[in-house]
Amino acid sequence: TLMQDIINGRCGWCGTDELYVKYHDEEWGKPVTDDKTLFEFLVLESAQAGLSWITILKKREGYRKAFCNFDAAQVAQMTDEDVERLMHFDGIVKNRLKIKSTITNAKLFLAIQKEFGSFYNYTLSFFPNRNPIINHFQSLSEIPVSSPESEAMSKDMKKRGFKFFGATICYAHLQASGF
């Protein structure tokens, strides 16, 4: 079907929404090595849990504003008062657990940076020979919802205390950031 095939070099899942097409063509699957962008994707992918990606893409600038331009160190310093303020901010999905988890995840993200030198290095540690995997899927039906790498990474992240980052979300995160 139209939504499942790769059409004109573009994955069918992005449909025709201009924002989605721009995201697909300019960002999705491009290798990301800088931790600030990896943190941004982590925040957005976590927020997406149970929702459609386009919902989060449409609120991306709201998330940028709400979460200190995706500065993990600043987000990690946010307080319960900030959570209350964000519960009244229309620019994001107003889910208390997700807002609080973003702050918790920021603290854990910083701990991983300290332990591994960068979140990028941490991510690479789950891949054979520390190299991203290049897939050549032809249709949506071929794409799995997780991978051995996303299973291992999400299990480790869960053990560390990360929230809203299971194997499926982790796989989407890895795909989006070029792993």
What residue spans do the PLM features occupy?
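HhH-family (HhH-GPD) DNA N-glycosylase catalytic core used in base-excision repair
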Residues: 1-179
